[in-house]
Amino acid sequence: MLIKKYLTKSYIKDVIILMLGSAILAFGLYHIHTQSNVTEGGVLGLTLLLQEWLHISPAISSLVMNAICYYIGWKTMGIKFIVYSGISGAAFSGFYAIFEQFPPIWASIGEYPLVAAIAGALFVGVGIGICVRVGGATCGDDALVMSISKVTKVEIQWIYLISDLTVLGLSLTYIPLRRILYSLLTVVLSGQIIGWIAKEK
């Protein structure tokens, strides 16, 4: 009965959209973020911060924080949210693993940090925005942001901005200011793009 409930045209369309968004996100993170060392806010940035401050492996901290965020998302958004998030998260991992099998399109993009920051924001913003629009979260911080936005009625891009600014500000304890500024540009732009796509009709 549960399978029959979800196997509808609307559900299949949503799954295709989730996979598309996850593919775009994975492409951007592999070909731009990884090659340029642009850092992030949210859970990813916080795991790097905890590794620097407390020597806690991101493998452990990300698992714990994502589990907490998804639990909050489940309690706030319901079971459909968890199903969609599971699909988008698995699709992201799959697509990223595929992209890793090929050389980066522009391996020297790190030499052009401004280009990397803007391009990275576009791929992250569009990829996550598409997933959020149909009700899925590719990672824990998206789940937390969506939950906070639903409860507080504050637009999603401003929740992203506040959380990312907080993490990036704390990251100044171990990352040079110049690199943080480029990362700030990325998270501000991507957050605005996510918010625009998520509410666009």
Model regions: which residues?
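Core subunits and conserved enzymes of cellular information-processing
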Residues: 2-201
